[in-house]
Design a protein with these regions (language model features):
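Bulky hydrophobic/aromatic content
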Residues: 5-74, 180-185, 189-206
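Polybasic (Lys/Arg-rich)
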Residues: 138-207
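Conserved glycine-centered beta->alpha loop in an early N-terminal alpha/beta scaffold
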Residues: 1
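Core beta-strand-centered patch of the WYL/Sm-like small regulatory domain
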Residues: 37-163
């Protein structure tokens, strides 16, 4: 049995976008934001980007149903434009969320900032296999990243302690489609000759 919201549907509970996205990323609990009192003072910088939950709901429903969407998307280069997307995954780059989707306008997979989708409508009809996640080679390909303290850092042991390095290196795996986000999020110098300022780039991509 499958339940789909009608046009008149209104949620009983109100949830913050941060909470909903955390559930999608880490798994669902009991479905309630209990707002438990903190055991110790603990604060973070917060998130300035808050996607529209109705858009997120439409996107995730299309992902589960393997259907296409007609969206209005705001691009920095071309402004508002209509696109046909087949959403296949969500990706968090540390600052904002992206929708990984097959772009029918350009016949390729790409990332679309979730908060820049201002309108989304599910399209009738089936999608092709080449539009689904299994056909996304960049998503399927796993790359190895070997991170070391930037050679320009005066005290590399401090960086090793920050990241819990073993033998002076941190080895991680990433989807090829997301590797750029990893490099940007952690300000990793990926230049061959580690030429970026070590005061802002504590890590260097050795491989």
């Amino acid at each position: 049995r499958c339940y789909r919201p009608a046009i008149t549907f209104k949620p009983v509970f109100e949830f913050s976008p941060d909470r909903v996205l955390a559930w999608l990323l880490h798994g669902f609990g009991d479905g309630l934001d209990l707002k438990l009192r903190k055991a110790a003072p603990c604060e973070g910088p917060g998130n300035l980007v808050r996607p529209d939950l109705s858009i997120l709901a439409t996107v995730t429903r299309a992902m589960c149903a393997k259907s296409a969407l007609k969206v209005t998307y705001l691009s920095l280069s071309s402004g508002a434009a209509s696109r046909e997307l087949v959403p296949v995954a969500l990706a968090d780059n540390g600052l904002r969320w992206h929708v990984r989707a097959f772009d029918r306008n350009k016949s390729r997979f790409g990332d679309f900032v979730l908060s820049r989708i201002t309108k989304a409508t599910e399209l009738p009809g089936s999608v092709e296999e080449y539009e689904l996640l299994g056909a996304d080679e960049q998503w399927a390909r796993i790359v190895d990243l070997e991170l070391v303290p930037h050679p320009g850092v005066a005290w590399p042991k401090a960086v090793e302690a920050d990241y819990g390095m073993t033998d002076g290196a941190l080895r991680i795996k990433s989807r090829a489609a997301l590797a750029g986000y990893v490099l940007r999020r952690w300000n990793i110098d990926s230049s061959p000759d580690h030429s970026l300022d070590p005061n802002f780039h504590h890590l260097w991509l050795r491989n």
